[in-house]
């Protein structure tokens, strides 16, 4: 189900994503303290979100069970680059709930440089 969610997101036809969302779907963004209620609101928000080009989604990892899953996805429109960590709840073949985190990259503190290697 999560693979299909991201496949549909990659079409940039965000109303098509409604096919895998429950009508009472809820998405929570704890970092900005926002909640989106309903598959239609999810589609409209993504349709109206300003972008510099089509959104491209690169799946880094998906794991879980038929009822719960987690994905780590790189998202870009060619200018904006982000990483989404999404926690999915699935029931009756539909995504019913998501909690999504959009972590911001930051520079590592200098004082631990001798213990780590850079990821590029």
PLM regions and their residue ranges:
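Alpha-helix C-capping/helix-to-loop hinge sites
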Residues: 5-8, 28, 72, 76
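A solvent-exposed, acidic/Ser-Thr-rich amphipathic alpha-helical stretch
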Residues: 14-19, 23-65
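A beta-strand edge to alpha-helix "cap/lid" segment located at domain peripheries
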Residues: 43-120
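Short, aromatic-enriched amphipathic alpha-helices that serve as compact interaction elements
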Residues: 1-13, 20
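Hydrophobic alpha-helical context, especially transmembrane and signal-peptide helices
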Residues: 2-3, 29, 84
């Amino acid at each position: 189900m999560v693979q299909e969610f991201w496949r549909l997101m990659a079409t940039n036809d965000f109303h098509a994503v409604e096919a895998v969302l429950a009508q009472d779907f809820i998405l929570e963004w704890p970092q900005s303290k926002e909640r989106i209620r309903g598959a239609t609101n999810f589609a409209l928000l993504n349709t109206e979100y300003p972008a510099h080009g089509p959104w491209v989604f690169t799946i880094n990892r998906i794991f879980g069970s038929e009822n719960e899953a987690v994905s780590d996805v790189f998202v870009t429109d060619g200018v904006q680059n982000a990483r989404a960590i999404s926690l999915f709840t699935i029931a009756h073949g539909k995504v019913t709930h998501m909690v999504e985190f959009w972590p911001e990259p930051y520079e590592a503190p200098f004082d631990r440089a001798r213990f780590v290697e850079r990821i590029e």
